[in-house]
Amino acid sequence: MKVVIAPDSFKESLTAKQVSEAIKSGLSRVWQDAEFVTVPVADGGEGTVQSLIDATEGEQVFVTVKGPIGNDVEAFYGILGDGETAVIEMAEASGLHLVPSEQRDPKNTSSFGTGQLILNALDRGIQRLIIGLGGSATNDGGTGMLAALGVKFLDSDGQPITPNGGGLVELASIDVSGLDARLAGCEVLVACDVDNPLCGEKGASAIFGPQKGATPADVELLDSALSKYGELTEQVTGKHVLTQKGAGAAGGMGAALLGYLPARLKPGIEIVLETVKLAEHVADADIVFTGEGRIDHQTVHGKTPMGVAKVAKEYGLPVIALAGCTGDNFQAVYECGIDAVFVCVPRAMSLPEALEEAEVNLANLAENVARLWQLPR
């Protein structure tokens, strides 16, 4: 019997690897002769780098970079087990969590540090980049990142502007002659789960600006600046970024990646599952386990359990999801490939208790599911 275990993390409690091991521990009490394959995964958001490192036996690389407001921050990215692929989360270097709430202002934040992470990966000979968007503090159109990679953004006097949201107001021309030539030989995959355009009422500034500290006046200013940036980008690169779906992701970082790098945007879960080769693992399996901290009506929208179930169902396999809790209309997952959902909280308990005991409770739940599976049918 071959069992594949491919869960996401239980946020604020267990990493995806810890969840995988807990489920394996419980199942092995009953299925003692089974072959277990653990594949910790993520949906392209928080925890993706660590999950891919764990799944491929890769390594962390720590780098001191410039944070969103210019201070030094210690960030990391992952080099996967193949030694050729780097996984970078934008939030590591340019995340909103790096900016104190009283200093949050997307006119003043820059994605420069994300560019420094990419540069470090190139210096290590990386040929394939996976870049996760989301959680950014920026609305600079990715100009900070591009500046770190050699692009010059100039005002009407030919002087460099500050590559942040506010600096874009002064943008008059773009010089790409210094863009790092090594990027042309790289494969760049961007984990992106939003389809917002760069500008307009559904654009980066209007939709994501307020949560980063933008006032209504700021939104208008930033949107206008991104529009001019988009026009110049199209002139310089010949690529249509103003109306491209996903260009507005992460404060316009999507536009920078699509315009200046050989990038392709894909749903995060698809990139992750392809990278960990989940299909190869489940092709000859008998049952698949997945899960996440909370399963509810949102789970069907590109979350890990749905991605895992989709792959498993291509091979006609049963899929069991284990969760910390369920929410409204969690039954929606039953229409999308998951056959049963089980919750690991064994009694009434506080949230701190549930988080602290999650590993033990999850293992016990997995054991009970295996025992149930053993019953004559």
Task: Walk through the language-model features, giving the residues of each.
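N-terminal loops that bind phosphate or other acidic moieties
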Residues: 1-133, 137-377
